[in-house]
Amino acid sequence: MISYSQIGQDIEVLKFYNNKKNGYFVEIGASDGIQLSNTYLLEKEFNWKGICVEPIPYQFKLLCKNRPNSICFDKAVYNQSNQIVIFDIANKRDLLSGISSHIDLHKKKVNSNKTQINVSTITMNDLLKQSNAPSFIDYLSIDTEGSEYEILKSIDFTKYTCGLIDVEHNYIEPKRTQIHNLLISNGYVFIRQNNFDDCYKYITNNNQQ
């Protein structure tokens, strides 16, 4: 089986769910929907459905073309909806792009050659509500180059549960510890580090498989 992910996240999801079909995903930072996608394999081969989010305009256009069966948003997921934030696009390396005020410090050199655009924000709660997402999300992937903690804070964990969460940390503190503490306090348990990602599962998610 061919992985489309950067470090095999899609294969790990399928292993975790024993090649489950018809699951539901949310991918924040979806790029063009195929290159380094954590959810394309799930949709293509296992009939998963879900939400893809990508604020960069030309990537969003490709995303809509490549993932017509997904619900696609061109917003920046954040801790408030309907705000305008400055979004840094790293020229020639747009996979390293992110919200200017949160982009990881070690990416500053990359973004010395950058383009800035204004992007409208949406919280996870509003994103899920507008998409009529189920209360149980099988897989949540967040790769936003620095704003991951703000995104997770915008989830109402009493309304939505994620069976498996992959969140990029890039070894940046205190962000990584803040993410860990937030998820642990809401019923999740750390299961593995996958290079620059941490993976968590919901404690009782076996009941949902």
Where are the model-predicted features located?
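Phosphate/nucleotide-binding beta-alpha loop and adjacent structural elements of enzyme active sites
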Residues: M1-Q209
